[in-house]
Swiss-Prot record:
<dbReference type="GO" id="GO:0009347">
    <property type="term" value="C:aspartate carbamoyltransferase complex"/>
</dbReference>
<protein>
    <recommendedName>
        <fullName>Aspartate carbamoyltransferase regulatory chain</fullName>
    </recommendedName>
</protein>
<feature type="binding site">
    <location>
        <position position="142"/>
    </location>
    <ligand>
        <name>Zn(2+)</name>
    </ligand>
</feature>
<dbReference type="GO" id="GO:0006207">
    <property type="term" value="P:'de novo' pyrimidine nucleobase biosynthetic process"/>
</dbReference>
<dbReference type="Pfam" id="PF02748">
    <property type="entry name" value="PyrI_C"/>
</dbReference>
<dbReference type="InterPro" id="IPR036792">
    <property type="entry name" value="Asp_carbatrfase_reg_C_sf"/>
</dbReference>
<dbReference type="GO" id="GO:0006221">
    <property type="term" value="P:pyrimidine nucleotide biosynthetic process"/>
</dbReference>
<dbReference type="GO" id="GO:0046872">
    <property type="term" value="F:metal ion binding"/>
</dbReference>
<keyword id="KW-0479">Metal-binding</keyword>
<feature type="binding site">
    <location>
        <position position="118"/>
    </location>
    <ligand>
        <name>Zn(2+)</name>
    </ligand>
</feature>
<comment type="similarity">
    <text>Belongs to the PyrI family.</text>
</comment>
<dbReference type="InterPro" id="IPR020545">
    <property type="entry name" value="Asp_carbamoyltransf_reg_N"/>
</dbReference>
<dbReference type="InterPro" id="IPR036793">
    <property type="entry name" value="Asp_carbatrfase_reg_N_sf"/>
</dbReference>
<keyword id="KW-0665">Pyrimidine biosynthesis</keyword>
<dbReference type="Pfam" id="PF01948">
    <property type="entry name" value="PyrI"/>
</dbReference>
<feature type="binding site">
    <location>
        <position position="113"/>
    </location>
    <ligand>
        <name>Zn(2+)</name>
    </ligand>
</feature>
<keyword id="KW-0862">Zinc</keyword>
Amino acid sequence: MISSSKRDELIVSKIRNGTVIDHIPAGRALAVLRILGIRGSEGYRVALVMNVESKKIGRKDIVKIEDRVIDEKEASLITLIAPSATINIIRDYVVTEKRHLEVPKQIRGLIKCPNPQCITNNDVEAESRFITISIKPLKLKCKYCEMYITEDDVIRQIL
């Protein structure tokens, strides 16, 4: 999947079908793989490019997964740790769908409130709900107990 054509250039071959997640902030690709439940033994062909130059965000990571399309829940979780990411769906070597991720104004059921006293941690029927306070840096507020969580808190939950 990887070949070198020039001294300073690394080329990752195209995938026939699957997903390419581009513009992931540098160092976050492993967290993206964790969200997707990919540990290396599932049989997917995966290309991971980390800490490469990007005109858009300075440095970035890229994840390519052959024969795997991510679902909405996975895309929503990726949005929280990589709000500038782009998800490209590939079919027969062609990008058939391109999604630019955006952090939603409200987040429901994706992450847990870290407050042990929050109703969402004490009532099995209560779904966690967070309101987005800021995107850069990511700051969310629990709708029930009003506890704030940051991007680092979200990453800790994922990892």
